[in-house]
């Protein structure tokens, strides 16, 4: 697998961790600002995941992606 493809996979894995962190944070939040923070983490994770998956698809279409 190409190094850039490994980074894309790691990025997608990171977004899963970010979503888990947002879930955990929301479960224990003590004030509204924490909720805002975890909402930003969640939104960012979804956006990063979307970009990483689009890049993965581009690599697949170009024939670069080897698993």
Predicted regions and their residues:
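Short, charged, low-complexity loops and linkers
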Residues: 1-6
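Short, charge-rich amphipathic interface segments used for partner binding and complex assembly
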Residues: 7-17, 21-65
């Amino acid at each position: 697998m190409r190094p850039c493809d490994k980074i894309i996979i790691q990025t997608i894995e990171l977004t899963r961790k970010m979503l888990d962190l947002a879930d955990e944070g929301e479960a224990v939040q003590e004030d509204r600002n924490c909720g805002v923070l975890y909402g930003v983490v969640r939104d960012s994770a979804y956006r990063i995941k979307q970009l990483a998956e689009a890049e993965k698809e581009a690599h697949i279409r170009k024939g670069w992606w080897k698993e």
